Amino acid sequence: MTTEKKTMNISEIQELLPHRYPFLLIDRVVDFQEEKYLHAIKNVSVNEPQFTGHFPQLPVFPGVLILEAMAQATGLLAFKSFGAPSENELYYFASVDGAKFRKPVVPGDQLIIEVEFIKERRGIAAFTGVAKVDGDVVCSAELKCARREF
């Protein structure tokens, strides 16, 4: 029995996340299951503004932006799992633990971001995340996001 993958295009992503260029780091969601997992894509282009300074002679996608892409993926999964926050609430990136960077990510790479829901308690949701390029893990971390008023 095959199950149809649930996806999100950029318009659907922008309905859920408040981020916009140049800080929206999820291009497409290729599959997700509420309260389980979400798989997303980030296409890395040399035209992105961070490459003017990181580093001009040898452009490398900053590790903190890989973590931010993972955090945005957890936010999308939280929205789909627990519903959209009210008008005065957001899912905030609350913490990152055990981050490991294994290989550099460069222009032309396609990041596959995979986050998995672990648990939720008092409005704080825990996830594991990995980012891959060509099937190789380039980054892994444990992340938390919190639903809070602003």
Curated annotation (Swiss-Prot):
It comes from the Bacteria. The gene is fabZ. The keyword Endoplasmic reticulum does not apply. Coiled coil: none annotated. This is 3-hydroxyacyl-[acyl-carrier-protein] dehydratase FabZ. Belongs to the thioester dehydratase family. FabZ subfamily. GO terms for molecular function: (3R)-hydroxyacyl-[acyl-carrier-protein] dehydratase activity. The active site is at H54. GO terms for cellular component: cytoplasm; membrane. GO terms for biological process: fatty acid biosynthetic process; lipid A biosynthetic process. Its EC number is 4.2.1.59. NCBIfam families: fabZ, PRK00006.1. It comes from Vibrio vulnificus (strain YJ016). The lineage of its organism: Bacteria, Pseudomonadati, Pseudomonadota, Gammaproteobacteria, Vibrionales. It is found in: Cytoplasm. Involved in unsaturated fatty acids biosynthesis. Catalyzes the dehydration of short chain beta-hydroxyacyl-ACPs and long chain saturated and unsaturated beta-hydroxyacyl-ACPs. SUPFAM superfamilies: Thioesterase/thiol ester dehydrase-isomerase. Keywords: Cytoplasm, Lipid A biosynthesis, Lipid biosynthesis, Lipid metabolism, Lyase. It catalyses: a (3R)-hydroxyacyl-[ACP] = a (2E)-enoyl-[ACP] + H2O.
